[in-house]
Amino acid sequence: MVAHLKNPGMFTSVSAFAPITNPVAVPWGEKAFAGYLGSVEAGKDYDATELVKNYSGPKPAILIDQGTADGFLHNQLKPENFAAAAAKAGYPCSVRMQPLYDHSYYMISSFLRDHIQHHATALGLRNM
């Protein structure tokens, strides 16, 4: 998501599984940005929620799948922050909350086909 939002027009489609969508607002991001970039403020350039607020390029719909049983959901991933920022910016985004899935292989393997279809459709390919 960050690669797309920092490089308008480079990507035709975008999707993610359980992404850290607002790292400047969570402990993982605060620690990483302060340690690697010198400040949390510098991390805004690598935060999808911050980037979508001012994005002005092409807007391919973003598909996000997130498990409701993911132990990182509420204190680290924050998909609701991204969804709200995207909606306010008029950016099409679908955040699908998947009941009982966590942050594991089974989450990805269960919904990978949907993500492949999302990209195939964006590329104008027939249904996979």
In which residue ranges do the predicted regions lie?
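Non-catalytic cap/lid and distal C-terminal segments of serine-dependent acyl enzymes
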Residues: 1-128
